[in-house]
C-alpha cells in the first residue's frame, strides 16, 4: 500500500498517529538540521519534516523537484503548516527521480508562455491551476449528464467515421476506409436526429473534428461536443432546457469546486432565468446604431459580439431567429417569415458556446433546403430515407465543452482548458 491518507485528509485530530502519504516533491527547503518538503498529491499540498540523523535525511538531501516519494511518518499538529499539521518522517522511499532542472516550473513562480506549457504539458498539468481546471470540467460534465437524465434523456454514441459531410461544409478530415474515402465526423447531427426519431430524447458527449484554419483562442481541430436532440419539441423548448443545464452546471461548479475556483481566483457568472433573448434582426439594428458596418445576412462575429455585450450588459444571452440561409440545411424556417429560421446561439459575453434550432422533419423540405445550398440530396439519402417513416418534429443543440470551460474558469484560450489540444500546428503531445 502506497498511502493510508491523502494530504488533505491530515488534520490536528490525527496528532501522534502514524500515516503513510505519497506524491510529488513540490518544494524543498534545507535549513541545515531539518529538511522541509512540500508534498503534493491529487488533493493538495502537505508539509513533511525530515530531521538530520534520520535514515530518510540522506535520501532526500539532494532530491529533485517533481520526484515521487512515499513517506512513513507521524502527524504533528502545527498551526503554521498546511491544514494545521505536518508529518515528521520516519522513513522515505524514493519511487522515481525527476531530472533537474525542470523544463517548466510546476510551482508557478517562474511563468511560462502557452507554447512552453503545451510542449511540457505533463508538468503543466501538475500545476494546481490546471488540476483545478480539470476538476471543474469533470463536475461540469457530470452536471450536464445529471440534468439530462432527470429530463428523461438517454445517452447515445454515434459513428465518428462517416461517409459524407454532416453540415455540408468543407471543414473535413478525410480518412482512408478500406480503400474508400471517408471522413472524421464534424458533428453527430444527422445520427442524433435519427435517434430522436426512435427514442425521442438523446444526448452525446464525444469528440468531433473540424479542419479549422482559424488560429484563434476559441478554435480547435479536435474538440468535445455535447449534443442534445429532442423529439416533439421546438427551439423554445430547447432554449428552456439549456437554461436549466447552464444554471445547474454553474451552481454545481460553485458548490463542488469552491477550492478550485479560489486557486483560479475566479467566480463564474450568475445565471438569471429566463436568459435574455435578442433577435438577430434586433441585434443587427443595435450594432448599426453603434456605428458597426454590418447588414442583414452577415455573421455576427466576435468583434460585433463584444459591442453587443457592452450594450446588453448580460453575461449570458440568446441571439435568436438567424437568417435561414446562414444556418445548416436541417434548420427549420419560421412560418411567419421564411427568410428567418427557428434557431439560436447562446452567447457568453462575446463567445458563442451553444448553437441550436428546430429541425426540418419533412423530407421534401429537407431536399429543397439541400438544393438551395448547392448540395446534392443523393449524398444524404442514408439520412433522408428515414423521413418517409413518421419522423416527428424535433429540435436540438450542440455545446462546445472547451468554450463552456472558459465561462467556468475565466481562462482566455481553449488551448488552456484541454489537456492535449489539437490545432493547425500541434499533433503532439
Curated annotation (Swiss-Prot):
Cofactor binding description: Binds 3 Mg(2+) cations per subunit. The strongest magnesium site (Mg1) is bound to the beta- and gamma-phosphates of ATP and four water molecules complete its coordination sphere.
Binding, L-aspartate: 167, 210, 355, 359
Sequence segments annotated as region (Aspartate): 189-192
Cystine pairings recorded for this chain: none
Locations listed in the record: Cytoplasm
Binding site for Mg(2+) 2: 352, 355
Enzyme's top EC category: ligase
Annotated site, Important for tRNA non-discrimination, chain positions: 82
BP-aspect Gene Ontology terms: aspartyl-tRNA aminoacylation
Molecular-function annotations in GO: aspartate-tRNA ligase activity; aspartate-tRNA(Asn) ligase activity; ATP binding; magnesium ion binding; RNA binding
Short name of one Pfam family: tRNA_anti-codon
Keywords: Aminoacyl-tRNA synthetase, ATP-binding, Cytoplasm, Ligase, Magnesium, Metal-binding, Nucleotide-binding, Protein biosynthesis
Positions of ATP binding: 210-212, 352, 400-403
CDD domains recorded: AsxRS_core
Primary localization class, coarse: cytoplasm
Cellular component, GO annotation: aminoacyl-tRNA synthetase multienzyme complex; cytosol
Cofactor(s) required for function per UniProt: Mg(2+)
Residues the entry annotates as binding Mg(2+) 3: 352
EC number(s) per entry: 6.1.1.23
Known catalytic reactions: tRNA(Asx) + L-aspartate + ATP = L-aspartyl-tRNA(Asx) + AMP + diphosphate
Quaternary state and interactors: Homodimer.
Function noted in UniProt: Aspartyl-tRNA synthetase with relaxed tRNA specificity since it is able to aspartylate not only its cognate tRNA(Asp) but also tRNA(Asn). Reaction proceeds in two steps: L-aspartate is first activated by ATP to form Asp-AMP and then transferred to the acceptor end of tRNA(Asp/Asn).
Similarity comment: Belongs to the class-II aminoacyl-tRNA synthetase family. Type 2 subfamily.
Protein's name in the database: Aspartate--tRNA(Asp/Asn) ligase
Species of the source: Saccharolobus solfataricus (strain ATCC 35092 / DSM 1617 / JCM 11322 / P2)
Gene that encodes it: aspS
Amino acid at each position: 500500500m502506497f498511502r493510508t491518507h491523502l494530504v488533505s485528509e491530515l488534520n490536528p485530530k490525527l496528532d501522534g498517529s502514524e500515516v503513510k502519504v505519497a506524491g510529488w516533491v513540490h518544494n524543498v527547503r534545507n535549513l541545515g538540521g531539518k529538511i522541509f518538503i512540500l508534498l503534493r498529491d491529487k488533493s493538495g499540498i502537505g508539509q513533511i519534516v525530515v530531521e538530520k540523523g534520520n535514515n530518510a535525511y540522506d535520501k532526500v538531501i539532494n532530491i529533485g523537484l517533481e520526484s515521487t516519494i512515499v513517506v512513513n511518518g507521524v502527524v504533528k499538529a502545527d498551526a503554521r503548516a498546511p491544514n494545521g499539521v505536518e508529518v515528521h518522517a520516519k522513513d522515505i522511499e524514493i519511487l522515481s527521480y525527476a531530472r533537474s532542472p525542470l523544463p517548466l516550473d510546476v510551482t508557478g513562480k517562474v511563468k511560462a508562455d502557452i507554447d512552453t506549457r503545451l510542449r511540457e504539458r505533463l508538468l503543466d498539468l501538475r500545476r494546481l491551476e490546471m488540476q483545478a481546471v480539470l476538476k471543474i470540467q469533470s463536475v461540469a460534465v457530470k452536471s450536464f449528464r445529471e440534468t439530462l437524465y432527470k429530463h428523461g434523456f438517454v445517452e447515445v454514441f454515434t459513428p465518428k467515421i462517416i461517409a459524407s459531410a454532416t453540415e455540408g461544409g468543407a471543414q473535413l478530415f478525410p480518412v482512408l476506409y478500406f480503400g474508400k474515402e471517408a471522413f472524421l465526423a464534424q458533428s453527430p447531427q444527422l445520427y442524433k436526429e435519427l435517434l430522436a426519431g426512435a427514442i425521442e430524447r438523446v444526448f452525446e458527449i464525444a469528440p468531433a473534428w473540424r479542419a479549422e484554419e482559424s488560429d484563434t483562442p476559441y478554435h480547435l481541430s479536435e474538440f468535445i461536443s455535447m449534443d442534445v436532440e429532442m423529439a416533439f419539441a421546438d427551439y423554445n423548448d430547447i432554449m428552456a432546457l439549456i437554461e436549466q443545464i447552464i444554471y445547474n452546471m454553474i451552481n454545481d461548479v460553485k458548490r463542488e469546486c469552491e477550492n478550485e475556483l479560489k486557486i483560479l481566483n475566479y467566480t463564474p457568472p450568475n445565471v438569471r432565468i429566463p436568459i435574455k433573448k435578442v433577435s438577430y434582426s434586433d441585434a443587427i439594428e443595435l450594432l448599426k446604431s453603434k456605428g458597426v458596418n454590418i447588414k442583414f445576412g452577415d455573421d455576427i462575429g466576435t468583434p460585433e459580439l463584444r459591442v453587443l455585450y457592452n450594450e446588453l450588459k448580460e453575461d449570458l444571452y440568446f441571439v435568436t431567429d438567424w437568417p435561414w440561409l446562414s444556418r445548416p440545411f436541417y434548420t427549420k424556417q419560421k412560418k411567419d417569415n421564411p427568410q428567418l429560421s427557428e434557431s439560436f446561439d447562446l452567447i457568453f459575453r462575446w463567445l458563442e458556446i451553444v448553437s441550436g434550432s428546430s429541425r426540418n422533419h419533412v423530407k421534401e423540405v429537407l431536399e429543397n433546403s439541400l438544393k438551395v445550398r448547392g448540395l446534392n440530396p443523393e449524398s444524404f439519402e442514408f439520412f433522408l430515407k428515414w423521413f418517409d417513416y413518421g419522423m416527428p418534429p424535433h429540435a436540438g443543440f450542440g455545446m462546445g465543452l472547451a468554450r463552456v470551460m472558459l465561462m467556468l474558469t475565466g481562462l482566455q484560450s481553449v488551448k488552456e482548458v484541454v489537456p492535449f489540444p489539437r490545432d493547425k500546428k500541434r499533433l503532439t503531445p
